[in-house]
A protein has these predicted regions:
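Parallel beta-helix/beta-solenoid repeats that form elongated, surface-exposed shafts/blades used
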Residues: 1-2, 81-83
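Extracellular disulfide-bonded cysteine-rich modules/repeats
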Residues: 87-97
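Exposed extracellular interaction/assembly regions and N-terminal maturation sites
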Residues: 2-73, 95-111
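Surface-exposed loop/turn and secondary-structure junction residues enriched for glycine/proline
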Residues: 34, 79, 86-87
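A conserved acidic, glycine/proline-rich C-terminal tail/linker
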Residues: 74-82
Length: 111
């Protein structure tokens, strides 16, 4: 289990300055986003990614394994408490007005 971070980045999220990284490669069974532009989830059989609205307002999630994506608050696309993404999926999320919205995706199944 590991987290590999790339280029350090300073971002302004919800009026707070956050020290984070542009990208993270995640090999954990559960991970909470931390302001990254992109995360890649790999080397685990399944993982749960929690979209943290306090530290993240926009993120791309690339899955190299099956993942469950949950918001810390609100819903995804105003309807879903969680979504399931199959291996090789790529999904772009934006937090707005208390919910997470899918801006772009491939490989999604009905959750």
């Amino acid at each position: 289990m590991s987290i590999i971070r790339t280029v350090p980045s300073t971002r302004l999220i919800n009026g707070q300055i956050l020290e984070t990284s542009e990208m993270a490669i995640i090999s954990e069974t559960e991970y909470k986003t931390n302001g990254e532009d992109c995360i890649i989830v790999r080397n685990v059989s399944e993982s749960t990614v929690i979209l943290d609205s306090k530290t993240t307002d926009h993120i791309v999630v690339k899955s190299m394994t099956r993942i469950i994506i949950k918001p810390d608050t609100g819903k995804i696309d105003e309807d879903y408490d969680e979504i399931v993404a199959d291996k090789y999926s790529c999904i772009e999320f934006r937090f707005c007005s208390g919910n997470w919205y899918i801006l772009s995706s491939d490989g999604l199944k009905n959750s």
